[in-house]
Curated annotation (Swiss-Prot):
The protein's name: Protein U52
Pfam families noted in UniProt: Herpes_UL79
Alphabetized InterPro entries for the sequence: Herpes_UL79 (IPR004290)
Family: Belongs to the herpesviridae UL79 family.
UniProt superkingdom: Viruses
Compositionally skewed regions (Polar residues) per UniProt: 1-18
Organism of origin: Elephantid herpesvirus 1 (isolate Asian elephant/Berlin/Kiba/1998) (EIHV-1)
N-terminal signal peptide: none
Amino acid sequence: MTRVSSVSASCTTTNPPKNTREDMSRVGAHLTIQNDFRHLIMQITEKIFTKSSLGSMKFEELKIIHMGCQTVFMRGILTLLTRECFWNTGNDDIRILNRNIPTSYWLEIHTLLEKFIPTTDPWIFSDVYAENTLQYLQKQNACVRLYQEYMLSKLGLYVPLPDFLREDVNILFHLGTVTQHRLFKTFMIFQKYWGIDSYEPIVRTIVRKTWFFFLILWGQLRVDSNVFCEQDFGHEAGILSYLQSDYLSFMGIGQIDISINKSSFPDVFSITDIKPLM
Protein backbone atom coordinates (compact mmCIF):
# COMPACT_ATOMS: atom_id res chain seq x y z
CA MET A 1 0.00 0.00 0.00
CA THR A 2 1.43 3.36 -0.98
CA ARG A 3 2.34 5.37 2.10
CA VAL A 4 0.65 8.75 2.17
CA SER A 5 2.23 11.56 4.18
CA SER A 6 0.28 12.92 7.14
CA VAL A 7 -2.29 15.50 6.10
CA SER A 8 -3.08 18.08 8.77
CA ALA A 9 -6.86 18.07 8.98
CA SER A 10 -8.48 21.16 10.42
CA CYS A 11 -11.05 20.76 13.16
CA THR A 12 -12.92 23.85 12.07
CA THR A 13 -15.44 23.18 9.34
CA THR A 14 -18.29 25.18 7.93
CA ASN A 15 -21.81 23.92 8.23
CA PRO A 16 -22.86 21.87 5.18
CA PRO A 17 -25.27 23.71 2.88
CA LYS A 18 -28.94 22.92 3.16
CA ASN A 19 -30.15 20.90 0.20
CA THR A 20 -33.56 20.36 -1.27
CA ARG A 21 -34.88 16.90 -2.04
CA GLU A 22 -33.99 17.43 -5.70
CA ASP A 23 -30.31 17.73 -4.70
CA MET A 24 -30.32 14.37 -2.92
CA SER A 25 -30.52 10.74 -4.03
CA ARG A 26 -31.51 7.81 -1.85
CA VAL A 27 -28.73 5.31 -1.14
CA GLY A 28 -30.31 3.46 1.78
CA ALA A 29 -33.58 2.94 3.59
CA HIS A 30 -32.43 5.67 5.99
CA LEU A 31 -29.76 7.43 3.91
CA THR A 32 -29.58 10.04 1.15
CA ILE A 33 -26.53 11.48 -0.59
CA GLN A 34 -25.72 14.81 -2.24
CA ASN A 35 -25.87 14.49 -6.02
CA ASP A 36 -22.89 16.84 -6.53
CA PHE A 37 -20.49 14.39 -4.86
CA ARG A 38 -22.37 11.18 -5.50
CA HIS A 39 -20.10 9.51 -8.05
CA LEU A 40 -16.81 10.27 -6.25
CA ILE A 41 -18.11 9.26 -2.82
CA MET A 42 -19.77 6.07 -4.04
CA GLN A 43 -16.69 5.08 -6.03
CA ILE A 44 -14.33 5.48 -3.06
CA THR A 45 -16.76 3.88 -0.60
CA GLU A 46 -17.36 0.85 -2.81
CA LYS A 47 -13.61 0.29 -3.21
CA ILE A 48 -13.07 0.43 0.56
CA PHE A 49 -15.51 -2.46 1.03
CA THR A 50 -14.84 -4.52 -2.10
CA LYS A 51 -11.09 -4.26 -2.70
CA SER A 52 -8.86 -6.86 -1.09
CA SER A 53 -6.30 -4.16 -0.25
CA LEU A 54 -6.23 -0.38 0.08
CA GLY A 55 -3.01 -0.55 -1.91
CA SER A 56 -4.99 -1.18 -5.08
CA MET A 57 -6.59 2.27 -4.85
CA LYS A 58 -5.29 5.44 -6.49
CA PHE A 59 -2.98 7.75 -4.57
CA GLU A 60 -5.50 10.59 -4.78
CA GLU A 61 -8.22 8.35 -3.33
CA LEU A 62 -5.97 7.27 -0.46
CA LYS A 63 -5.12 10.88 0.27
CA ILE A 64 -8.82 11.78 0.53
CA ILE A 65 -9.49 8.76 2.76
CA HIS A 66 -6.53 9.57 5.00
CA MET A 67 -7.57 13.20 5.41
CA GLY A 68 -11.20 12.23 6.07
CA CYS A 69 -10.29 9.70 8.75
CA GLN A 70 -7.91 12.16 10.42
CA THR A 71 -10.69 14.75 10.51
CA VAL A 72 -13.03 12.32 12.28
CA PHE A 73 -10.44 11.31 14.87
CA MET A 74 -9.34 14.89 15.53
CA ARG A 75 -12.91 16.09 15.94
CA GLY A 76 -13.56 13.16 18.28
CA ILE A 77 -10.52 13.93 20.45
CA LEU A 78 -11.51 17.59 20.67
CA THR A 79 -15.00 16.52 21.76
CA LEU A 80 -13.57 14.27 24.48
CA LEU A 81 -11.25 17.03 25.72
CA THR A 82 -14.18 19.44 25.86
CA ARG A 83 -16.23 16.91 27.80
CA GLU A 84 -13.46 16.50 30.36
CA CYS A 85 -13.14 20.28 30.62
CA PHE A 86 -16.83 20.69 31.50
CA TRP A 87 -16.86 17.73 33.87
CA ASN A 88 -13.87 19.10 35.79
CA THR A 89 -14.89 22.77 35.84
CA GLY A 90 -13.90 24.29 39.18
CA ASN A 91 -12.25 21.07 40.34
CA ASP A 92 -8.76 21.27 41.81
CA ASP A 93 -8.74 17.95 43.66
CA ILE A 94 -5.76 16.00 42.31
CA ARG A 95 -7.26 12.67 43.35
CA ILE A 96 -10.38 13.29 41.25
CA LEU A 97 -8.54 14.79 38.28
CA ASN A 98 -6.08 11.90 38.26
CA ARG A 99 -8.60 9.10 38.84
CA ASN A 100 -8.41 7.61 35.32
CA ILE A 101 -4.80 8.43 34.45
CA PRO A 102 -2.02 5.80 34.68
CA THR A 103 1.37 6.65 36.19
CA SER A 104 3.04 5.89 32.85
CA TYR A 105 1.35 8.95 31.33
CA TRP A 106 2.96 11.31 33.84
CA LEU A 107 6.35 9.69 33.30
CA GLU A 108 6.00 10.44 29.58
CA ILE A 109 4.97 14.02 30.34
CA HIS A 110 7.98 14.41 32.64
CA THR A 111 10.31 13.12 29.93
CA LEU A 112 8.89 15.68 27.48
CA LEU A 113 9.13 18.42 30.10
CA GLU A 114 12.85 17.79 30.54
CA LYS A 115 13.43 18.35 26.82
CA PHE A 116 12.48 22.02 26.73
CA ILE A 117 12.24 23.26 30.35
CA PRO A 118 15.35 22.94 32.55
CA THR A 119 14.34 21.49 35.90
CA THR A 120 15.28 18.94 38.53
CA ASP A 121 13.23 16.10 39.93
CA PRO A 122 13.17 17.28 43.57
CA TRP A 123 11.80 20.67 42.46
CA ILE A 124 9.15 19.39 40.10
CA PHE A 125 7.81 16.72 42.48
CA SER A 126 8.00 18.63 45.77
CA ASP A 127 4.70 19.49 47.47
CA VAL A 128 6.34 22.54 49.04
CA TYR A 129 7.02 24.09 45.64
CA ALA A 130 3.90 22.77 43.89
CA GLU A 131 2.31 26.22 43.60
CA ASN A 132 5.50 27.79 42.28
CA THR A 133 5.82 24.94 39.82
CA LEU A 134 2.31 25.55 38.47
CA GLN A 135 2.95 29.28 38.14
CA TYR A 136 6.19 28.58 36.29
CA LEU A 137 4.46 26.19 33.89
CA GLN A 138 1.73 28.75 33.22
CA LYS A 139 4.23 31.55 32.66
CA GLN A 140 6.16 29.46 30.15
CA ASN A 141 2.92 28.29 28.50
CA ALA A 142 4.31 24.84 29.22
CA CYS A 143 0.98 23.03 29.54
CA VAL A 144 0.01 23.77 25.95
CA ARG A 145 3.54 23.04 24.75
CA LEU A 146 3.51 19.71 26.57
CA TYR A 147 0.13 18.93 25.05
CA GLN A 148 1.49 19.64 21.58
CA GLU A 149 4.67 17.63 22.14
CA TYR A 150 2.74 14.67 23.54
CA MET A 151 0.33 14.66 20.59
CA LEU A 152 3.21 14.84 18.13
CA SER A 153 4.98 11.95 19.86
CA LYS A 154 1.88 9.72 19.79
CA LEU A 155 0.04 10.79 16.64
CA GLY A 156 2.49 12.73 14.50
CA LEU A 157 0.12 15.73 14.69
CA TYR A 158 -1.89 17.55 17.31
CA VAL A 159 -5.47 18.72 17.55
CA PRO A 160 -5.59 22.55 17.62
CA LEU A 161 -7.13 23.75 20.87
CA PRO A 162 -9.79 26.46 21.19
CA ASP A 163 -9.00 29.29 23.61
CA PHE A 164 -11.02 27.91 26.51
CA LEU A 165 -8.94 24.71 26.46
CA ARG A 166 -5.62 26.49 25.94
CA GLU A 167 -6.32 28.54 29.07
CA ASP A 168 -7.48 25.57 31.16
CA VAL A 169 -4.85 24.76 33.81
CA ASN A 170 -6.14 21.17 33.91
CA ILE A 171 -5.50 20.51 30.20
CA LEU A 172 -2.85 17.87 30.95
CA PHE A 173 -5.30 16.03 33.21
CA HIS A 174 -7.93 16.17 30.46
CA LEU A 175 -5.39 14.83 27.96
CA GLY A 176 -4.32 12.04 30.32
CA THR A 177 -7.90 10.83 30.64
CA VAL A 178 -8.56 11.05 26.89
CA THR A 179 -5.44 9.00 26.08
CA GLN A 180 -7.11 6.01 27.78
CA HIS A 181 -10.13 6.22 25.48
CA ARG A 182 -10.45 3.65 22.69
CA LEU A 183 -10.86 6.42 20.11
CA PHE A 184 -7.46 7.91 20.95
CA LYS A 185 -5.79 4.49 20.93
CA THR A 186 -7.41 3.60 17.60
CA PHE A 187 -6.14 6.89 16.17
CA MET A 188 -2.64 5.95 17.37
CA ILE A 189 -2.87 2.63 15.52
CA PHE A 190 -4.21 4.32 12.38
CA GLN A 191 -1.40 6.89 12.32
CA LYS A 192 1.36 4.43 13.19
CA TYR A 193 0.51 1.72 10.67
CA TRP A 194 -0.98 3.68 7.78
CA GLY A 195 0.89 2.71 4.61
CA ILE A 196 2.57 -0.41 6.07
CA ASP A 197 1.57 -3.40 3.95
CA SER A 198 1.78 -6.01 6.71
CA TYR A 199 -0.76 -4.04 8.78
CA GLU A 200 -3.12 -3.27 5.90
CA PRO A 201 -6.00 -5.44 7.26
CA ILE A 202 -5.83 -3.52 10.54
CA VAL A 203 -5.88 -0.14 8.81
CA ARG A 204 -8.68 -1.20 6.44
CA THR A 205 -10.81 -2.29 9.41
CA ILE A 206 -10.42 1.15 10.97
CA VAL A 207 -10.97 2.96 7.67
CA ARG A 208 -14.29 1.25 6.91
CA LYS A 209 -15.99 2.61 10.02
CA THR A 210 -14.18 5.96 10.13
CA TRP A 211 -14.70 6.86 6.47
CA PHE A 212 -18.41 6.10 6.66
CA PHE A 213 -18.78 8.34 9.71
CA PHE A 214 -16.77 11.05 7.93
CA LEU A 215 -19.35 11.12 5.14
CA ILE A 216 -22.08 11.71 7.73
CA LEU A 217 -19.99 14.28 9.63
CA TRP A 218 -19.18 16.10 6.38
CA GLY A 219 -22.87 16.22 5.48
CA GLN A 220 -22.53 14.23 2.26
CA LEU A 221 -24.58 11.35 3.67
CA ARG A 222 -27.79 12.47 5.36
CA VAL A 223 -29.43 10.24 7.95
CA ASP A 224 -33.24 10.18 8.11
CA SER A 225 -34.54 11.18 11.53
CA ASN A 226 -36.83 8.14 11.73
CA VAL A 227 -33.84 5.81 12.14
CA PHE A 228 -33.53 7.04 15.72
CA CYS A 229 -37.23 6.51 16.44
CA GLU A 230 -37.74 2.96 15.19
CA GLN A 231 -36.21 -0.02 16.96
CA ASP A 232 -34.52 -2.65 14.84
CA PHE A 233 -32.59 -5.84 15.62
CA GLY A 234 -29.69 -4.37 13.65
CA HIS A 235 -29.28 -1.60 16.22
CA GLU A 236 -27.60 -4.07 18.56
CA ALA A 237 -24.33 -3.72 16.62
CA GLY A 238 -24.45 0.08 17.00
CA ILE A 239 -26.10 2.82 14.97
CA LEU A 240 -23.08 3.33 12.69
CA SER A 241 -22.84 -0.38 11.83
CA TYR A 242 -26.58 -0.40 11.21
CA LEU A 243 -26.39 2.53 8.78
CA GLN A 244 -23.35 1.01 7.08
CA SER A 245 -25.23 -2.26 6.53
CA ASP A 246 -28.21 -0.28 5.27
CA TYR A 247 -26.03 1.44 2.66
CA LEU A 248 -24.31 -1.75 1.49
CA SER A 249 -27.59 -3.69 1.22
CA PHE A 250 -29.42 -0.91 -0.61
CA MET A 251 -26.56 -0.41 -3.10
CA GLY A 252 -26.02 -4.15 -3.59
CA ILE A 253 -22.40 -4.02 -2.43
CA GLY A 254 -20.96 -7.28 -1.14
CA GLN A 255 -18.11 -6.45 1.19
CA ILE A 256 -14.99 -8.57 1.47
CA ASP A 257 -14.62 -9.91 5.00
CA ILE A 258 -11.45 -9.00 6.85
CA SER A 259 -9.87 -11.76 8.91
CA ILE A 260 -7.63 -10.58 11.74
CA ASN A 261 -5.83 -13.03 13.99
CA LYS A 262 -5.07 -11.46 17.36
CA SER A 263 -1.87 -13.48 17.71
CA SER A 264 -0.57 -12.07 14.40
CA PHE A 265 -0.77 -8.46 15.62
CA PRO A 266 0.23 -8.51 19.30
CA ASP A 267 1.62 -4.96 19.13
CA VAL A 268 -1.72 -3.64 17.87
CA PHE A 269 -3.87 -5.48 20.39
CA SER A 270 -1.53 -4.42 23.20
CA ILE A 271 -2.75 -0.88 22.48
CA THR A 272 -6.47 -1.67 22.19
CA ASP A 273 -8.85 -4.32 20.89
CA ILE A 274 -10.06 -3.24 17.44
CA LYS A 275 -12.35 -6.24 16.88
CA PRO A 276 -15.44 -4.21 17.92
CA LEU A 277 -14.84 -2.23 14.71
CA MET A 278 -15.25 -5.33 12.55
